[in-house]
UniProtKB/Swiss-Prot annotation:
Domain of life assignment: Eukaryota
Record domain SAM: where: 118-184
PROSITE patterns assigned to the protein according to its UniProt record, in alphabetical order: SAM_DOMAIN
Organism this protein belongs to: Mus musculus
Gene3D superfamilies registered for this protein in UniProt: Transcription Factor, Ets-1
Region described as Disordered: spans on this chain: 1-22
Pfam family, one: SAM_2
Name used for this protein in its record: Sterile alpha motif domain-containing protein 10
Organism lineage string: Eukaryota, Metazoa, Chordata, Craniata, Vertebrata
Length: 202
């Protein structure tokens, strides 16, 4: 009795290999749709990778950090400092005037460097030209103290005495020539400044 009642109440078992209606076909449909989607995506990716990509690149440009840094270094432009209006001096004119007009060295007929840039050898040549009588005495004293052009313009009687020129006549001779040199350098400096100002106005 109980066996018959249980057989009536319990639902019939599905046979092996049987497929439920409306349920067994959906996994196959989902799997096929997923497979076709993946295949389409893969084909699109491969086709995109196979497309040759040529970026327009002008000469001198670069796409890497190192190349761009070298490019900036090679194409760097001089930085112009801020100046007041009307106070700018053309650099080309200033350099040409400084090294073409502002020259007083005795070695090449007054066409080399300014006195402040004279070496010890230039000072010795100047002494030989302007103080020929006691030239050897002056050259020995100036060489021992390494007198250059800048130091030559700053000489006075006390410095010459400490350098070993004990005679007053010798000191006066050197100081007189140094004074002439200072006046000549001052005049050349004023000429350079006036030419630079005139070039700025024009």
């Amino acid at each position: 009795m109980f066996t018959e009642l249980r057989s009536k109440l319990s639902p019939p078992r599905a046979r092996a290999g049987a497929v439920r209606p409306g349920f067994g076909e959906r996994p196959d449909v989902d799997a096929s749709a997923h497979f076709s989607f993946c295949q389409t995506l893969l084909e699109h990716t491969v086709s995109a990778e196979n497309i040759p990509c040529h970026l327009p690149r002008t000469p001198g440009t670069s796409l890497t950090w190192h190349d761009s840094r070298s490019q900036r270094a090679s194409s760097s432009r001089p930085i112009k400092l801020l100046q007041q209006p009307g106070s700018e001096i053309p650099q080309a004119r200033l350099y040409s005037d400084h090294y073409g007009l502002y020259h007083t060295s005795p070695s090449l007929g007054g066409l080399t460097r300014p006195v402040v840039l004279w070496s010890q050898q230039d000072v010795c040549k100047w002494l030989k030209k302007h103080c020929p009588h006691n030239y050897l005495v002056y050259v020995e004293a100036f060489s021992q103290h390494a007198i250059t052009g800048r130091a030559l313009l700053r000489l006075n009687a006390d410095k010459l005495q400490r350098m070993g020129l004990t005679q007053e006549a010798q000191r006066q001779e050197v100081l007189q020539q140094v004074l002439h040199l200072q006046v000549r350098e001052e005049g050349r400096s004023l000429k350079l400044l006036s030419q630079a100002s005139f070039g700025n106005m024009s």
